[in-house]
From Swiss-Prot:
Keywords: Cytoplasm. The keyword Cytoplasm applies. It is found in: Cytoplasm. InterPro entries: DUF2129. GO terms for cellular component: cytoplasm. The lineage of its organism: Bacteria, Bacillati, Bacillota, Bacilli, Bacillales. Belongs to the UPF0298 family. This is UPF0298 protein GWCH70_0997. Its main location: cytoplasm. The keyword Cytoplasm applies.
């Protein structure tokens, strides 16, 4: 139903060129302090988009986002770990 999407992190020399990234995908976030932008495109097009972006003169570095490959369902702790008390560095004796 929905196409698989993947983020691409683009490190820039200057932020004034960040508007040019619109033609490569959907811009999700732009950091002014660290000078990078996160944009999303279809998962099938990630490799060719990264090559195109890396060839631009105002781009320092291009990295893929590994979020689609991370396991986001976490296991809960067992009852033994939940009920155990942790020492605070001193004894209450």
């Amino acid at each position: 139903m929905f196409p698989k999407r993947q983020g691409i992190i683009v490190w820039l020399h200057s932020l004034k060129h960040s508007k040019h990234l619109r033609k490569f995908g959907n811009i999700h976030y732009v950091s002014k302090r660290l000078k990078y932008a996160v944009l999303y495109c279809d998962m099938e097009q990630v490799d060719e988009m990264m090559k195109k972006l890396a060839s631009l003169p105002f781009v320092k570095r291009v990295e893929p986002s590994y979020r689609p490959f991370l396991k986001l369902e976490f296991e809960s702790k067992g009852e033994k770990e939940k009920n155990s008390s942790y020492p605070l560095g001193y004894s209450a004796e």
